[in-house]
From Swiss-Prot:
Protein name: Large ribosomal subunit protein eL34
GO terms of biological process kind: translation
Gene assigned in the entry: ribL34e
One protein family per Pfam: Ribosomal_L34e
Origin: domain of life: Archaea
Listed InterPro entries: Ribosomal_eL34 (IPR008195), Ribosomal_eL34_CS (IPR018065), Ribosomal_L34e_arc-type (IPR047868)
Source organism of this protein record: Pyrobaculum aerophilum (strain ATCC 51768 / DSM 7523 / JCM 9630 / CIP 104966 / NBRC 100827 / IM2)
PROSITE patterns membership: RIBOSOMAL_L34E
HAMAP family found in the cross-reference section: Ribosomal_eL34
Single GO MF annotation: structural constituent of ribosome
One GO cellular component term noted in the UniProt record for this chain: ribosome
Alphabetical keyword list: Ribonucleoprotein, Ribosomal protein
Stated family: Belongs to the eukaryotic ribosomal protein eL34 family.
């Protein structure tokens, strides 16, 4: 029986053949998807592909709400803010 942390389906199972001829199961975290805008669902532009390996300062664009909202949502919000 695998340990409790490995029973979850959020962990990927890979069958590996050992030099001794046995087949064992290795567990690894599933790859995360591209970060998406919560409003439009578009992928956020300017984000590094290796998102979770780097800190937020390195991977996110330097614009306001960079790394959170897509450029279309930001442009719309800025236009509304200027008009008020």
């Amino acid at each position: 029986m695998p340990r409790p942390a490995y029973r979850s389906r959020s962990v990927r199972r890979i069958k590996v053949k050992t030099p001794g001829g046995r087949t064992v199961i290795h567990y690894e975290k599933r790859a995360k998807g591209v970060p998406k805008c919560p409003i439009t669902g578009l992928p956020i532009g300017g984000m590094n592909k290796k998102v979770y390996r780097f800190g937020i300062k390195i991977r996110a664009p330097s614009r306001p709400y960079g790394g959170v909202y897509s450029h279309k949502v930001l442009a719309r919000a800025l236009r509304l803010a200027v008009r008020k």
